[in-house]
């Protein structure tokens, strides 16, 4: 679904698509690992232990979270740099718009489903 939204918005040529998708998929894999393995585990630990957490432990978790977020930022910068030789600047902007639109659409769908269950 996401791939079709991106493909439609970017109107990739065959050559662009052949170069773009491996870069995009590698980036998605990397950011998903950071988001779900690092950031999520830190947030779970914070939620489960916040009531009895010492300042020392809170500081440690803040540092871990900051490190993971910096890693995510670095990954995004590398991704944009890698795309610069494949897509025009306009298409890179269109990619960001397509991803944002997709997220909004998915969030709206989740809210709709959640509302339907209540």
Description of each model-found segment:
Residues 4, 9, 26, 73-118:
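Amphipathic, charged alpha-helical segments and their helix-to-coil junctions
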Residues 5-86:
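Amphipathic alpha-helical segments
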């Amino acid at each position: 679904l996401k791939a079709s939204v991106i493909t439609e918005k970017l109107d990739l040529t065959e050559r662009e698509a052949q170069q773009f998708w491996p870069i995009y998929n590698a980036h998605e894999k990397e950011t998903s690992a950071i988001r779900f393995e690092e950031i999520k585990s830190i947030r779970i630990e914070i939620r489960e232990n916040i009531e009895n957490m010492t300042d020392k432990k809170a500081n440690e978790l803040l540092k871990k979270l900051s490190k993971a977020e910096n890693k995510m930022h670095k990954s995004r910068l590398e991704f944009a740099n890698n795309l610069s030789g494949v897509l025009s600047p306009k298409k890179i902007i269109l990619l960001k718009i397509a991803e944002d639109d997709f997220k909004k659409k998915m969030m709206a769908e989740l809210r709709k489903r959640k509302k339907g269950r209540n």
